[in-house]
Amino acid sequence: MALFHGVINSKALMKDTTLSMIVPSDDRKNIGFQGQPQLLILLHGAGGSNYTWSKYSSIERYTEPLNLIVLMPNIEFSFGLNMSNGLNYQSYLGEELPQWAEKTFGLKLDRETTTIAGQSMGGFAAIHTALAYPDKFGKCGVFSAPLA
C-alpha cells in the first residue's frame, strides 16, 4: 500500500486541485487481490481537505489488506455541487475523477466496482453525486451528513 499526495488539473473545476490517494502494493499475497482493484472516492467534511482522512483516521490500515484504490479529493466548501461560478464539483466527482482513475491506473470501472463515500459535507456530496450518476456508483457511504 502506498499513500500519495499530489496535484491534478481539472477541466470541470477549471484549475489545479489537490488529491490524495491510497494505492494497493504490488505485493499480491493479500487474499483480496484477485483481478483489478476497486475504486473508493472518499470525501472530507467542511473545513477538511484531501489530507483529512489520512491524517485523522486509520484509513491506510483499514484498506491495506484490500484490493482498493482510495481517491481523496479536495472538494473545499463546495458540498460537491456544480456552482454558478464554473466550479463544477459534481461533474468532477461523478465524471472526471472516475475517468482519471481509469486512465491513470488502467481500470475498467463500472457501478459494481466504484463507491463514493464521505463524512458530513462530504457525505452530502457523496449521496448527491451517487444519485446523479447511478450508472457510475453502485455503493454510497454517508457518515453524519446533512441530507436536505
Predicted regions and their residues:
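Non-catalytic cap/lid and distal C-terminal segments of serine-dependent acyl enzymes
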Residues: M1-A148
